[in-house]
Amino acid sequence: MRHRKSGRQLNRNSSHRQAMFRNMAGSLVRHEIIKTTLPKAKELRRVVEPLITLAKTDSVANRRLAFARTRDNEIVAKLFNELGPRFASRAGGYTRILKCGFRAGDNAPMAYIELVDRSESKAEATAE
């Protein structure tokens, strides 16, 4: 029985899930908006929000924790230099999930997940 087990399995083993969310978190931090399936977006929110909360307090220990979770120095730099200060006054809720219809091949529900205070120049580039 799966009583009180949190998180979705997403038909993957644990190492595949961990690698997938590590890559997706890096993409979300880098591009500030990504398109994925709705269940993956909802699970990704549980990975990215604690990373941004960690980035609000800049210290060597926090940078090492963030690197351990993302394995990418470029992502760690953006988290602590841009996103941490940007969300300093916001107490959680750094991401927004927007449903965007269904995928053509398998009718899977799709969604955009984006950072809330995303800069408008990136929004215009994504729209084009």
Curated annotation (Swiss-Prot):
Instruction: Name the Gene Ontology molecular function terms of this record.
Output: structural constituent of ribosome
Q: Name any one Pfam family assigned in the record.
A: Ribosomal_L17
GO CC terms: cytosolic large ribosomal subunit
Biological process terms from the Gene Ontology for this record are: translation
* Keyword check for Ribosomal protein: yes
Highest taxon above the source species: Bacteria
Cite the entry's keywords alphabetically.
Answer: Ribonucleoprotein, Ribosomal protein
Q: How does it assemble?
A: Part of the 50S ribosomal subunit. Contacts protein L32.
NCBIfam families xrefs: L17
Family, as annotated = Belongs to the bacterial ribosomal protein bL17 family.
Q: What is this protein called?
A: Large ribosomal subunit protein bL17
Natural source organism: Enterobacter sp. (strain 638)
**Which gene produces this protein?**
rplQ
